[in-house]
């Protein structure tokens, strides 16, 4: 009774007020799986292509074309297929699209159906998605990377770097980790208010204050950690997403807010100075996606001290990840479902990373919905780490709440990844 008997997609709205694709897959047993795809603000040049309408509706960002592909070609091709063979379903859609980057039908069309099929399979098996994808061994709750200060493409302020995160590695459970994060978030709001800084939030729910420098963002977070009663470098560590491709111009790393410009070696030294001075545990996209020589320098200098995550660098693509592994570039990959466009390919990237000794961080996008698939995915794959924003905005909090539910359902079997998620903490 696992045959696909119906597929339907619609245009819905994401957390930034832009359209996105939601799909429903119905099986012969009568169960239905539903999923909605996210969308990024800063995107890697080699990501799978998100199909937009480019007409007058929604400033050109409508997704009627992608929805039409789901309700037409994709539906016709998949009706009657066994949903339980997700790899075959995904493979059929990839074959149908016929392009290397899913540009004909749209990665947003393929991913909506792929995710919905996974949900339908889980419902048909009478189990939660994390158990269906991960089996009995899926008991590890991830350390959240909580983006509490937003800059770069995620905020309208003068901070160059995109995300300043807190990692509650010292918590004993995901529920406690969320509490740590929420208490620091509220303490930070008070710190910023006292300074006369804006407490408006960015796309991912973090504050987006105008600060005199990127380093000032670290300083206010450390103050908030202390005021909340936690110890930085023990209870809570720091993480950065530089999104360096966004300020890499003509071979230079240009921090406009500080009036500074660096070559690759200089920017590596700049980041190394921060690592030596602050309790930084992870740096994402420390170098630009096309600066592989710079990445090599960064990995050689800091790879033994901190987690170096490739996002725009690897774009959840196994071919690019393999090249990085072979060249000893970075030591971690950010996993975004919509960068590659199917669940099967996403799982393959996670498997490749883990096999090579790289960590895998499951991630949201800046444009999200109430869909919580990534929470289940983080547990299913035992990734040990998740990025899903700050402690505000329901599109972010929905994922934390799902992790709390999963932890409760697992009961005594549940394990919080904590310090064990990071080799750098021994």
UniProtKB/Swiss-Prot annotation:
Q: Which residues bind Mg(2+)?
A: 241, 284, 311
EC number(s) per entry:
4.2.1.11
- What SUPFAM superfamilies does the record point to? Enolase C-terminal domain-like, Enolase N-terminal domain-like
Q: Which cofactor does it need?
A: Mg(2+)
Where does it primarily localize? cytoplasm
Q: How is the cofactor bound?
A: Binds a second Mg(2+) ion via substrate during catalysis.
Active site residues per record: 204 (proton donor), 336 (proton acceptor)
**Listed SMART domains:** Enolase_C, Enolase_N
Compartmental location:
Cytoplasm; Secreted; Cell surface
Q: In which pathway does it act?
A: Carbohydrate degradation; glycolysis; pyruvate from D-glyceraldehyde 3-phosphate: step 4/5
What's a BP term from Gene Ontology annotated to this protein?
Answer: glycolytic process
What's one GO MF term for it?
magnesium ion binding
Q: Which reaction does it catalyse?
A: (2R)-2-phosphoglycerate = phosphoenolpyruvate + H2O
Which of UniProt's keywords are assigned here? Cytoplasm, Glycolysis, Lyase, Magnesium, Metal-binding, Secreted
Enzyme category, top tier: lyase
GO CC terms, sorted: cell surface; extracellular region; phosphopyruvate hydratase complex
Which of this chain's residues are annotated to bind (2R)-2-phosphoglycerate?
Answer: 162, 336, 365-366, 387
Quaternary structure per UniProt?
A: Component of the RNA degradosome, a multiprotein complex involved in RNA processing and mRNA degradation.
Q: Which PANTHER family match?
A: ENOLASE
Summary of the function given for this chain in its UniProt record: Catalyzes the reversible conversion of 2-phosphoglycerate (2-PG) into phosphoenolpyruvate (PEP). It is essential for the degradation of carbohydrates via glycolysis.
Q: Which family does it belong to?
A: Belongs to the enolase family.
Name this polypeptide is given? Enolase
Q: Which organism is it from?
A: Thioalkalivibrio sulfidiphilus (strain HL-EbGR7)
Protein's gene: eno
């Amino acid at each position: 009774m696992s045959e696909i008997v119906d597929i339907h997609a619609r245009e819905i709205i994401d957390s930034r007020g832009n359209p996105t694709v939601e799909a429903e897959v119905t099986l012969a047993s009568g169960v239905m799986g539903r999923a909605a795809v996210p969308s990024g603000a800063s995107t890697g040049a080699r990501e799978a292509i998100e199909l937009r309408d480019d007409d007058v509706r929604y400033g050109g960002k409508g997704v009627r074309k992608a929805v039409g592909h789901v309700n037409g070609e994709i539906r016709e091709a998949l009706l009657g297929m066994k949903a339980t063979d997700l790899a075959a379903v995904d493979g059929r859609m990839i074959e149908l699209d016929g392009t290397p980057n899913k540009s004909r039908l749209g990665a947003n069309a393929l991913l909506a159906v792929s995710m919905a099929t996974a949900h339908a399979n889980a419902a048909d098996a009478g189990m939660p998605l994390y158990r269906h994808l991960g089996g009995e061994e899926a008991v590890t709750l991830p350390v959240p990377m909580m983006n509490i200060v937003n800059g770069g493409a995620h905020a309208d302020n003068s901070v160059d770097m995109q995300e300043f995160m807190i990692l509650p590695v010292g918590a004993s459970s995901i529920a406690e980790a969320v509490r740590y994060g929420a208490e620091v978030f509220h303490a930070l709001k008070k710190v910023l208010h006292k300074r006369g800084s804006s407490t408006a939030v960015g796309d991912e729910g973090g504050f987006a204050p105008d600060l005199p420098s990127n380093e000032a963002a670290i300083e206010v977070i450390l103050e908030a950690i202390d005021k909340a009663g936690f110890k930085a470098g023990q209870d809570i560590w720091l993480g950065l997403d530089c999104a360096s491709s966004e300020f890499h111009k003509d071979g230079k790393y240009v921090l406009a807010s500080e009036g500074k410009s660096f070559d690759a070696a200089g920017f590596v030294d700049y980041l190394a100075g921060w690592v030596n001075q602050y309790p930084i545990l992870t740096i994402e996209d420390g170098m630009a996606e096309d600066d592989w020589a710079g990445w090599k320098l960064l990995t050689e200098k800091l790879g033994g001290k901190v987690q170096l995550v490739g996002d725009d660098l690897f774009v959840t693509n196994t071919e690019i990840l393999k090249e990085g592994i072979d060249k000893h570039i970075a030591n971690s990959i950010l996993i975004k479902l919509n960068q590659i466009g199917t669940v099967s390919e996403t799982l393959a990237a996670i498997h490749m990373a883990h096999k090579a000794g790289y960590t895998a961080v499951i991630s949201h996008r800046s444009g999200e919905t109430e869909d919580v698939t990534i929470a289940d995915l983080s547990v299913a794959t035992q990734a040990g780490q998740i990025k899903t924003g700050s402690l505000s905005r329901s599109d972010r909090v929905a994922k934390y709440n799902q992790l709390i539910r999963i932890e409760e359902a697992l009961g005594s079997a549940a394990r919080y990844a904590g310090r064990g998620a990071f080799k750098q903490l021994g």
